[in-house]
């Protein structure tokens, strides 16, 4: 944790969830709106097909909603794509950009990520920007070179603590059940914090840095209590309210 930075817990449902899943979303919202809510902010990034329905279902709740990706243009001949303005209109306040699955499967470069962040800002969305190394890059001692390239290339000038959240997600930990030690996470988050302070000054000191990569109830306390970790980006464990809220409950003990 970092003093004076309100924690942020984000869930990424990826390509999971239908209308029936709104029950889980309501349960998450109910838990967040209870006495837990004042301890942190919570966000669920649902599939685009659910966003408008979820926004209507959760009207007046404390749970934030977000998209999982957006195009770098505001409109145009891009079959199948979704703009940041469309996400905003459907009820999103945030959007995940640069997730490792987008960087690898869809070959999204840092320049594309940067352009998408600017598109998110134009629409009034907060950009949740993901960075992280592969297993090969870690074993080759290239972690900090990779992070430097991603941070410098993916974040436009004008980033502030209000329009950007950064998530460190080691690619080798995502969906594998394996997560780095708290010492490794602390080292990386300290590096990211230093980079943000050097470039963005006071805003860099206030930016929320999340950890993402096989976060689950069994390791949440260790990860969320790590220095410079201001929350989590949760994948599979965000699909069930009981798992997501168990992770959130860690903030009662910190």
From Swiss-Prot:
Pfam families: TIM
Enzyme class: isomerase
Pathway: Carbohydrate biosynthesis; gluconeogenesis; Carbohydrate degradation; glycolysis; D-glyceraldehyde 3-phosphate from glycerone phosphate: step 1/1
Keywords, alphabetical: Cytoplasm, Gluconeogenesis, Glycolysis, Isomerase
Binding site for substrate: 12-14, 175, 214, 235-236
EC number, UniProt record: 5.3.1.1
Molecular function GO labels: triose-phosphate isomerase activity
GO biological process: gluconeogenesis; glyceraldehyde-3-phosphate biosynthetic process; glycerol catabolic process; glycolytic process
GO cellular component: cytosol
Subcellular location: Cytoplasm
Swiss-Prot/TrEMBL catalytic activity: D-glyceraldehyde 3-phosphate = dihydroxyacetone phosphate
Oligomer and partners: Homodimer.
HAMAP family tied to this protein: TIM_B
PANTHER family, sorted: TRIOSEPHOSPHATE ISOMERASE
Role: Involved in the gluconeogenesis. Catalyzes stereospecifically the conversion of dihydroxyacetone phosphate (DHAP) to D-glyceraldehyde-3-phosphate (G3P).
Family assignment from sequence similarity: Belongs to the triosephosphate isomerase family.
Name assigned to this protein: Triosephosphate isomerase
Organism expressing this protein natively: Bartonella quintana (strain Toulouse) (Rochalimaea quintana)
Gene behind this protein: tpiA
């Amino acid at each position: 944790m970092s003093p004076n930075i309100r924690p942020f817990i984000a869930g990424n449902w990826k390509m999971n969830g239908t209308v029936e899943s709104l029950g889980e979303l309501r349960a998450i919202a109910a838990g967040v709106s209870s006495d837990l809510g004042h301890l942190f902010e919570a966000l669920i990034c649902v599939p685009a097909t659910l966003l408008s329905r979820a926004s209507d279902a959760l009207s007046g709740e404390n749970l934030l909603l977000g998209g999982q990706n957006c195009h770098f243009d505001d409109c145009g001949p891009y079959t199948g794509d979704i703009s940041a303005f469309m996400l905003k209109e459907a009820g999103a306040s945030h959007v995940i950009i640069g997730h490792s699955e987008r960087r690898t499967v869809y070959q999204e470069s840092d320049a594309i990520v940067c352009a998408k962040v600017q598109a998110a800002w134009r629409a009034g969305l907060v950009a949740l920007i993901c960075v992280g190394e592969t297993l090969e890059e870690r074993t080759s001692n290239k972690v900090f070179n990779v992070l430097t390239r991603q941070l410098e290339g993916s974040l436009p000038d004008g980033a502030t603590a209000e329009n950007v959240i950064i998530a460190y997600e080691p690619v080798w930990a995502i969906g594998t059940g394996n997560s780095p030690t708290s010492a490794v996470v602390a080292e990386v988050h300290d590096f990211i914090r230093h980079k943000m302070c050097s470039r963005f000054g006071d805003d860099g000191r206030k930016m929320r840095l999340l950890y993402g990569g096989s976060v689950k109830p069994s390791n949440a306390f260790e990860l969320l209590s790590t220095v410079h970790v201001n929350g989590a980006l949760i994948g599979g464990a965000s699909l069930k309210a009981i798992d997501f809220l168990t992770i959130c409950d860690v903030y009662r003990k910190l």
